Curated annotation (Swiss-Prot):
<dbReference type="Pfam" id="PF01701">
    <property type="entry name" value="PSI_PsaJ"/>
</dbReference>
<dbReference type="GO" id="GO:0031676">
    <property type="term" value="C:plasma membrane-derived thylakoid membrane"/>
</dbReference>
<comment type="similarity">
    <text>Belongs to the PsaJ family.</text>
</comment>
<feature type="transmembrane region" description="Helical">
    <location>
        <begin position="9"/>
        <end position="29"/>
    </location>
</feature>
<dbReference type="GO" id="GO:0015979">
    <property type="term" value="P:photosynthesis"/>
</dbReference>
<dbReference type="InterPro" id="IPR036062">
    <property type="entry name" value="PSI_PsaJ_sf"/>
</dbReference>
<dbReference type="GO" id="GO:0009522">
    <property type="term" value="C:photosystem I"/>
</dbReference>
<keyword id="KW-1133">Transmembrane helix</keyword>
<keyword id="KW-0793">Thylakoid</keyword>
<keyword id="KW-0812">Transmembrane</keyword>
<dbReference type="InterPro" id="IPR002615">
    <property type="entry name" value="PSI_PsaJ"/>
</dbReference>
<protein>
    <recommendedName>
        <fullName>Photosystem I reaction center subunit IX</fullName>
    </recommendedName>
</protein>
<keyword id="KW-0603">Photosystem I</keyword>
<keyword id="KW-0602">Photosynthesis</keyword>
<keyword id="KW-0472">Membrane</keyword>
<comment type="function">
    <text>May help in the organization of the PsaE and PsaF subunits.</text>
</comment>
Length: 44
């Protein structure tokens, strides 16, 4: 019988990478929503 929370699958590299990239993208998107112009520094 398959356990619902299989720790070997959850701790595998693709799952950890997907969670990490989703979290990072969410942080950047929310930061850009509240502070829209801080991620792009113009040269002038």
């Amino acid at each position: 019988m398959f356990k619902i929370l299989n720790t070997k699958f959850v701790r595998s590299a693709p799952v950890v990478a997907a969670i990490w990239l989703s979290l990072t993208a969410g942080i950047i998107i929310e930061f850009n929503r509240f502070f829209p112009d801080l991620l792009f520094h113009p040269m002038s």
